[in-house]
């Protein structure tokens, strides 16, 4: 079942407010990652939901105190996961009246297919005002595919990349699920990464490549993969990641946009 919930909130600066609202809800590829257009997920994937908290109350010392709760309802509307409200406290260092919020829900490898609803509820502990938002997602049947696609600033995948600038190193992290194994008990999965410029032209004549075909324990259902992309010039690009199961003769592709800013 769904598990491993993480709720985070980082401050861009709330101020005195007349009301509390949750706005700009969007699915993303990982924490601080680019927007994800599809709300369809394979078992083993992770749902990242980003949103903005507007109108929280800041004290004289800039502290903002609030609670966040999350509930997941499965097909038919029955609640299958609930995390009670958790107290959060941040400091209004930059002023303003907005806090970015994030929710993460891990989808189990055996999660039943169907439509699920995530409900986030935020309460301003000073004003006692409450606001909620809902996000529907669809869990697909098990299949070969790429899951847990995230962007990080470190090879361990622990530091979200966030805004991108010239000179940075970008790590594209993903996992492969639903693969088959050959006669020797090993998978044979080829990975490719291409970067396309704003006009859709590949930035390199050949894609970055990798292969997973040995050393995989017999019971491992997930294959991790990673590519390093050096951000040497500004612009808008599309990153295209492809996985091919050469045992089953199946391929899947995921793509997402990135914008690299000039650092001055």
Model-identified regions with their sequence ranges:
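Sec-dependent N-terminal signal peptides
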Residues: 2-12
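Intrinsically disordered, low-complexity terminal regions enriched in Ser/Thr/Pro/Gly
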Residues: 15-264
């Amino acid at each position: 079942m769904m598990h491993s919930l993480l709720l985070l909130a980082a401050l861009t600066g709330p101020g005195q407010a007349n009301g509390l609202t949750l706005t700009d809800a969007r699915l993303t590829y990982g924490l601080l990652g680019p927007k994800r257009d599809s709300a369809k997920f394979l078992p083993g994937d992770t749902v990242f939901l980003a949103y903005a908290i507007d109108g929280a109350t800041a004290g004289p010392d800039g502290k903002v105190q609030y609670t966040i709760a999350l509930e997941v309802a499965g097909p038919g509307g029955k609640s299958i996961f609930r995390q009670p409200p958790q107290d959060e406290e941040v400091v209004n260092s930059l002023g303003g009246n907005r806090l970015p919020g994030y929710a993460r829900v891990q989808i189990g490898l055996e999660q039943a297919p169907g439509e699920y609803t995530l409900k986030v509820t935020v309460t301003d502990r000073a004003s006692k005002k409450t606001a909620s938002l809902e996000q529907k997602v669809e869990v697909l049947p098990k299949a070969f595919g790429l899951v847990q696609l995230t962007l990080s600033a470190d090879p361990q995948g622990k530091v979200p990349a966030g805004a991108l600038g010239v000179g940075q190193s970008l790590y594209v992290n993903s996992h492969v699920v639903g693969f088959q194994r050959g006669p020797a008990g090993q998978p044979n999965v080829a990975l490719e990464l291409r970067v396309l410029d704003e006009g859709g032209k590949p930035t390199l004549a050949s894609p970055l490549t990798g292969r997973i075909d040995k050393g995989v324990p017999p019971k491992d259902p997930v294959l991790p993969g990673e590519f390093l992309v050096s951000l040497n010039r500004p612009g808008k690009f599309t990153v295209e990641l492809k996985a091919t199961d050469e045992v089953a003769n199946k391929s899947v592709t995921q793509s997402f946009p990135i914008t690299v800013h000039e650092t001055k």
